[in-house]
Amino acid sequence: MTNIRKHHPLAKMINHSFIDLPAPSNISSWWNFGSLLGLCLVIQITTGLFLAMHYTSDTATAFSSVTHICRDVNYGWIIRYLHANGASMFFICLFMHIGRGLYYGSFTFLETWNIGITLLFAVMATAFMGYVLPWGQMSFWGATVITNLLSAIPYMGTNLVEWIWGGFSVDKATLTRFFAFHFILPFIIAALVMIHLLFLHESGSNNPSGIPSDSDKIPFHPYYTIKDLLGAILLLLTLFSLVLFSPDLLGDPDNYTPANPLNTPPHIKPEWYFLFAYAILRSIPNKLGGVLALALSILILALIPFLHSAKQRSMMFRPLSQCLYWVLVADLLTLTWIGGQPVENPFITIGQVASVIYFSTILILMPLTNLLENKLLKW
């Protein structure tokens, strides 16, 4: 068995990636989220495939086909809710994974970090298009509002929006192409994950202390396979609890009303995992400025490796940076809350203040704190 594992070309690749992989001996549970994201992707592709067997991407029948899945297909309701709530679990794991990378300085692996940002954009695009497919009120109006943002691009904006819509409004052509992209993107994500892992295994994993761990490695199996298994069990327990007890907890009631272009919902909002970016978009009165701020709220992650001026990689021994990090986390939670509120005072003001804090913390306060810590440590 060992002979096959170490010499067969295919088994050798798996062995080097998941069995005999040298891993730091001190990585904590924060390193579990990578494998949990892999599990989420498998769940989403599997449930999505079964949903696609029954779904029809036509404006006249899309809403009815989702109802048919829930009522008439064997265990269709559980497949549908696993897919919808699986997306929420996916984003929870994504945010934790990125948060861990920021806290422990994993962003210094430039290639791995940049592929990760590409993955984040791909997952966000997939989730957005998936939200449009049930063709409820929030699906239709969410698609209309978000795609319309591209019209802020000077000179070519309007043409670009109509090209994406496949007409002069969100209609059958839009739904069909969104379904096609929603189906293909997870497989592109899976390919990007392979590249992400390839670059990660070139350098080896980071660890909580942020110092090289080449002198103290242990094999991935059995130590971290068991650890990842515990994380997977907890994830599945949370997901199934959500699906079986409160499947609509994270959804929007408006999406149980079929799409009606003649009736605008009082408050259009995306899924909860986009609310922080949506709040930043809304906090700027100018349309183009809002779109740029929306894009920068995610793209700013690509700047973090270049803004890192601390002599220590991890925040583990840097209390001032830790304080700022938790300010940033609290700020993102505030933005998420604001994104779900109506556009009126005091929510507008809170959103604007939170947006300023978000950008100034990352672009100004964190680099300055890094320099101050270097000074205090006489480095």
From Swiss-Prot:
Binding site for heme b b566: 97, 196
Cofactor detail note: Binds 2 heme b groups non-covalently.
The keyword Cytoplasm belongs to this UniProt entry's keyword annotation: no
GO cellular component, one term: respiratory chain complex III
SUPFAM superfamilies xref list: a domain/subunit of cytochrome bc1 complex (Ubiquinol-cytochrome c reductase), Transmembrane di-heme cytochromes
The protein's role, per its UniProt record: Component of the ubiquinol-cytochrome c reductase complex (complex III or cytochrome b-c1 complex) that is part of the mitochondrial respiratory chain. The b-c1 complex mediates electron transfer from ubiquinol to cytochrome c. Contributes to the generation of a proton gradient across the mitochondrial membrane that is then used for ATP synthesis.
Protein name: Cytochrome b
Gene source species: Otolemur garnettii (Small-eared galago)
Gene: MT-CYB
